UniProtKB/Swiss-Prot annotation:
Keywords: Repeat, TPR repeat. The keyword Repeat applies. This is Tetratricopeptide repeat protein 27. TPR repeats lie at residues 457-490, 496-529, 531-564, 565-598, 600-632, 633-666. It comes from the Eukaryota. Pfam families: TPR_16. Gene3D superfamilies: Tetratricopeptide repeat domain. Belongs to the TTC27 family. The keyword Coiled coil does not apply. It comes from Mus musculus (Mouse).
């Protein structure tokens, strides 16, 4: 690309020109030319007028025309103009085509996102000979929407003026290699990607690859981002990149882009607390959550290069709550202290971006909702730009729909937002200010949100009317199914199929009837290009536990479109059911690549690795799972087992603590045995460190466990082992071991029926003997004889109790002797009891 940038490119990117720029254009002779007219129309928002211009007619019309597909015709016409026109210089031809591409994209956005309605038809700029191939405009639209299918994903059926997106695609994508004079071209291609993707049912790998390529190219154009103008454009660019990355599950890259935009803006944006009132009758100020925005530098951006605010009467109205108790907004005790600086368009877009990133990276939770509402209040406190106002209000309505006091406002507000599209009071130029930084949804998505809200409120008839008008048949089916009108859903789908057969309708019919033949029909109708058909067929197989067939269909679906997160997850589950752990590992690996914070996918991936005996990989994947979900006790349980398997004993101890946080009386004897064995036997862990260094941490863990699980003798015995089991050289360790073993013995003797079962009785006797030996060792180290005697007396009582129970339960009636199988144990107890008596007497003599 040439080093010098065409001067109008920066103005086009920001959506308006400065006086200085217009003066330069005049000096360069742009103003009086066709390029000057195109440029003026674009910057005025008169995109339709550009299509009636004679130059556009020349580019798109041809008197010599063979029968051919509309996309190849348009591409050939535009390429012919670029290569063969003799009236203009090559660079001028490139500039005109580029301006036509930008205008097509902007007009398409107006037709489907911002409004007001566009009065432009294909016959206004295409030759009649070409249009004669189609019986009506709808026929042409259907052909074009077929051409806009990517990776087997269909375009929304009521997309308006798809011819405009096709022209934009041809210029900004197909022939972009011919527009070498335009340095901002890849940025406009990125904007096209963002728009086209929002029309598709699923994410398109083709579009994502194109987006990444465009981002790399723009990053190399350093002269785009020079000076004050460049700084503001840099903020816009990084925000646009962030939204693209976010949509394609690239959360880390998105976060980095949002951070870069925030750094360039030099804003400090923090969630904080402030004293305030939320209700009309609240007497005292209490802590409220707010967003505090500060500038790091006192000097704001130059207003010359930032869009001028839109008059408030032209913005979507922020409706009052009209509640008799809750205030419309929080009333702060010290509002001046938290007064937000007067923000420009780019700065407000940064606040919105931080809000969006926060929403995507936090769980659905009441606290998260409150934090997001704080962001919307912040944004709505400075109503200046249509796109930002729309985005903030749409988010607020989603958050308020679950509140009984706010749901009525949410419905009224959503209706007002849906009506914005047809409102002609606000020009498209005002609506497009900062538009690509805000991810405003298309107008049908807003109407769909309204219908969903109406359905939740029980207004099923009104919701159905909207869904049917939008031809959102899946939602229509859901409405009827939930209302129990199963036959009605089938009837509507068959009526639509009589009008026109589409793969999507057959898939929906298959969902209703649970009939594989419908999916097969959709597959054939799509010429084996419908990822949805194979996806739906696979899900039916999965529901019927036909895992082999399910896997085959899912594999076909992801081959067409590998960016289907839910399909990879379900495919992994199907492979697990088939015990094909290699297949499940591959599927869940793709799943976590697409969505790195999917804890369940990480957990299932680790399960696959465990079954494949790749335990180190399992350990690492579980670490990732826990980063995503710190509260999931099943993941922690898998983690603790895997940690002990691979020798990560320190991690196992941490995991056990976390499980005690999550499940108060959690207990896993097997894990505790492994940890005790590792510490007592001084084993080495995975990194080569000796486990004995963990002795203190393990003792701390047992202290916590035994404070909650007090009645398990095995736990107390393991705790005693950590303290040396009474064989330590340290008297205090032996004392602790004795205490643990005493409690273990108490637990054993409090269990039921042990005294009547010879095997169980023998085991208790052996433990009592062991406890007595530890008591004797402890007594030896006591400096105070009375304490030593007390220790020995407690175990003597245990032994006497056992002798009594043996005599009571295991004495032969004829001989009067204790049962032979216990004879040796009873003899040992008698001898030990006598020894303890002698030792106690000796100690008493020291009093």
């Amino acid at each position: 690309m040439p080093g010098m940038m065409w001067t109008p490119e920066l103005a086009l990117l920001r959506g308006f020109s400065t006086e200085a720029e217009r003066l330069v254009w005049k000096q360069e002779g742009i103003c009086g030319s066709d390029i000057g007219v195109f440029l003026e129309l674009l910057l005025e928002g008169s995109y339709e007028a550009l299509f009636f211009h004679s130059t556009t007619q020349t580019i798109l019309n041809s008197t010599m025309m063979a029968e051919e597909k509309i996309d190849s015709y348009l591409e050939k016409q535009i390429v012919n103009f670029l290569d063969c026109s003799t009236d203009l210089e090559e660079i001028e031809r490139q500039q005109l085509v580029f301006l036509l591409g930008v205008s097509s994209l902007q007009l398409f956005v107006q037709s489907n996102w911002t409004g007001p309605l566009v009065d432009l038809h294909p016959q206004d700029f295409l030759p009649s000979g070409l249009l004669e191939q189609f019986s009506e405009v709808k026929g042409l639209d259907a052909i074009i929407m077929g051409l806009l299918i990517l990776d087997g994903e269909s375009v929304y059926s009521l997309t308006s003026k798809p011819i405009l997106l096709l022209i934009a695609r041809i210029i900004l994508v197909n022939i972009r290699h011919k527009l070498t004079a335009l340095q901002s071209l890849p940025w406009w291609t990125l904007r096209y990607v963002n728009i086209h993707q929002q029309l598709l049912e699923e994410r398109s790998p083709q579009l994502f690859a194109l987006a990444k390529n465009c981002i790399d190219q723009v990053m190399k154009q350093e002269n785009l981002f020079e000076g004050d103008s460049g700084r503001l454009l840099a903020i816009q660019f990084h925000l646009e990149c962030a939204h693209v990355f976010l949509y394609y599950y690239e959360y880390k890259e998105a976060k980095d882009q949002f951070s870069t935009a925030k750094d360039i803006s030099k804003l400090e944006i923090d969630l904080t607390g402030a004293l305030g009132k939320r209700t009309r009758f609240q007497e005292n100020y209490v802590a409220q959550l707010i967003v505090d925005v500060r500038r790091k530098e006192a000097v704001p951006f130059s207003c010359e290069f930032s869009p001028a605010p839109t008059p408030q009467e032209c913005l979507a109205k922020n409706l009052e709550l009209n509640d008799d108790t809750v205030l419309n907004e929080i009333k702060l005790a010290d509002s001046e202290r938290f007064q937000m600086p007067d923000l420009c368009a780019e700065e407000l877009a940064v606040v919105l971006g931080v809000c969006t990133n926060f929403q995507k990276n936090n769980p659905v939770h009441k606290l998260t909702e409150e934090e997001l509402l704080a962001f919307t209040s912040c944004l709505l406190s400075q109503p200046k730009f249509w796109a930002i106002q729309m985005s903030a209000l749409i988010l607020r309505t989603k958050l308020e729909r679950g509140s009984t006091r706010r749901v009525e406002r949410a419905m009224r507000q959503t209706q007002a937002l849906a009506d914005q599209f047809e409102d002609k009071a606000t020009s498209v130029l005002e609506r497009l200010k900062i538009f690509y930084c805000c991810q405003v949804p298309p107008h049908w998505a807003v109407q769909r949100q309204l219908a969903g809200l109406l359905f939740e409120l029980g207004c099923t008839s009104s919701a159905l009317q909207i869904f049917e008008k939008l031809e959102m048949w899946e939602d229509v089916v859901i409405c009827h199914e939930r209302a129990g009108r199963h036959g009605k859903a089938e009837e509507i789908l068959r009526q639509e199929l009589e009008k026109k057969e589409t793969p999507g309708l057959y898939c929906l019919l298959g969902d209703v009837l649970q009939d594989h033949s419908c999916y097969d029909k959709a597959w054939e109708l799509s010429r084996h290009r419908s990822a949805r058909a194979q996806r739906s067929k696979a899900l039916l197989h999965l529901r019927n536990k036909e895992f082999r067939e399910c896997v085959e269909c899912f594999e076909r679906s992801v081959k067409i479109n590998p960016m289907q997160l839910g399909v990879w997850f379900s495919l992994g589950c199907a492979y697990l059911a088939l015990e094909d752990y290699g297949g499940s590992a591959k599927a869940f690996q793709r799943c976590v690549t697409l969505e790195p914070d999917n804890a369940e996918a990480w957990n299932n991936l680790s399960t696959s690795y465990i079954r494949l005996k790749q335990k180190v990989k399992a350990f690492r994947t579980l670490q990732e799972a826990l980063k995503c979900n710190y509260e999931h006790w099943q993941i922690w349980e898998n983690y603790i087992l895997t940690s002990t398997d691979v020798g990560e004993f320190g991690e196992a101890i941490k995991a056990y603590h976390r499980l005690l946080d999550l499940r108060d009386k959690y207990k896993d004897i097997q894990v505790l045995k492994i940890l005790v064995q590792a510490v007592v036997n001084d084993m080495t862990d995975r990194s080569g460190a000796v486990a004995s260094s963990l002795k203190g941490k393990l003792q701390e863990l047992f202290g916590r466990i035994t404070s909650r699980v007090t009645n398990d003798g095995e736990v107390w015995r393991l705790y005693a082992q950590v303290h040396g089991n009474g064989q330590s050289e340290k008297p205090d360790e032996n004392d602790k071991a004795f205490q643990c073993l005493s409690k273990a013995y108490k637990c054993d003797t409090q269990s039921s029926c042990w005294e009547k079962d010879a095997t169980a009785f023998k085991e208790v006797v052996q433990r009592a003997i062991g406890l007595a030996h530890v008591a004797m060792k402890c007594a030896e180290s006591k400096s105070i004889p009375q304490e030593a005697v007390q220790t020995l007396s407690s175990v003597r009582l245990n032994l006497r109790g056992l002798l009594s129970k043996a005599k009571q339960n295991f004495t032969d009636v004829v001989s009067g002797e204790v049962s032979g199988e216990l004879a040796s144990e009873i003899a040992a107890v008698n001898a030990l009891e006598a020894e303890l008596q002698d030792l106690s007497n000796q100690l008493r003599n020291r009093y």
